[in-house]
Amino acid sequence: MIRYPNGKSYQPIQPIGTKKRISGESSYSNRGMTLEADLNETNQYYLVNGIAVIHKKPTPVQIVNVDYPKRSAAVIKEAYFKQSSTTDYNGVYRGRYIDFEAKETKSTTSFPLKNFHEHQIEHMKQVEKQGGICFVIISAFGSVYYLPASDLFFFWERQKLNGRKSISKDELMEAGHLMTLGYSPRIDYIKVVETLHFSDESEYQ
Amino acid sequence: MIRYPNGKSYQPIQPIGTKKRISGESSYSNRGMTLEADLNETNQYYLVNGIAVIHKKPTPVQIVNVDYPKRSAAVIKEAYFKQSSTTDYNGVYRGRYIDFEAKETKSTTSFPLKNFHEHQIEHMKQVEKQGGICFVIISAFGSVYYLPASDLFFFWERQKLNGRKSISKDELMEAGHLMTLGYSPRIDYIKVVETLHFSDESEYQ
């Protein structure tokens, strides 16, 4: 039996199509589910089973006007969405800092880099420099990929050099780690983190 | 010259009262500054100098109604403050996960435990279990203390046992690590993290 380092047994993943999955439908748009919902379920699974503590950060909001009615809760009457200067998810696995962003595309040929903005790339570079484990989870072409931040940086810099504004399907399949979707956890990205950063044959530190 | 592990030189702290500090005033309420502002400045200092990447999480808000006017930004028309289930600050230092909450009290005799709620304590326990570095920064009695989460747990559990709903001044001075306030960084909590978790004489892992 495969066990996580904390001694918890690893629950084997089930193929798409069992239980709540509708057979034959694999893209998020078709399934009526979202990448975010699947990641929240995954993080909840990690938390409950003591595998990792990873949370999605709240949506950043600029609050302009708040009403404080008597005998009831404060009501925010005017606020605006702010662009985040960091990534959406972070937390801890085996003491190490984990930081990632999740994105999906409906394009069938490539993943557009406009899904990220300069501030986020800058943040990811700072995290890598500080020894954190940083990556992006990309849902594209009917699959979900784990792309290490260092690879994203390569494509980001190339955009500046030759103007190519996307990662082609072939490139993503080559640089990314394909994740098999399961029932619970749905997107077992910690398995990839474990392989890349903690196993004996780890390519990374 | 003292250097951080990344080779950056340590900027010696300056006593309270120099530059923008008004001599003789040491509590946040008197100075017209907030603990949060000082921590934001400190985190900015760490970021710019490549010492650590720590951010305050956005305030969690439950969005109920959003207006999408033509040709201008979406306006949130109704939203409510939500209780956070985690702590306010997290990030990475030398690869390790850092997680903390900051609180201040105007009480002159003790620090009330009602500043925390069960969900936050639960989160801090999960972080500790996962090998993260977790603590609280408490501004009280004219000083700022770094209290390891494990000590906070002790006082939290005692509350359940004998009903004492606060940490006395003496107890905080005994269990907490007094931080000298500086000009930049203002509250050098990473110095305490370094001593407790990374130096040869580290009491912790």
Curated annotation (Swiss-Prot), chains A, B:
GO molecular function, one term: endonuclease activity
BP terms from Gene Ontology: chromosome segregation; DNA recombination; DNA repair
Location (main, coarse): cytoplasm
Enzyme class: hydrolase
Alphabetized Gene3D superfamilies for the sequence: 3.40.1350.10
UniProt entry keywords in alphabetical sequence: Cytoplasm, DNA damage, DNA recombination, DNA repair, Endonuclease, Hydrolase, Magnesium, Metal-binding, Nuclease
Residues where Mg(2+) binds: T86, D88, E101, Q120
Pfam families in alphabetical order: RecU
Region (Disordered): 1-26
SUPFAM superfamilies (UniProt xref): Restriction endonuclease-like
Cofactor: Mg(2+)
Site positions per UniProt: Transition state stabilizer: K103
Recorded superkingdom: Bacteria
Any GO CC annotation of this UniProt entry: cytoplasm
Similarity-based family: Belongs to the RecU family.
Listed NCBIfam families: PRK02234.1-5, recU
Function comment: Endonuclease that resolves Holliday junction intermediates in genetic recombination. Cleaves mobile four-strand junctions by introducing symmetrical nicks in paired strands. Promotes annealing of linear ssDNA with homologous dsDNA. Required for DNA repair, homologous recombination and chromosome segregation.
The protein's name: Holliday junction resolvase RecU
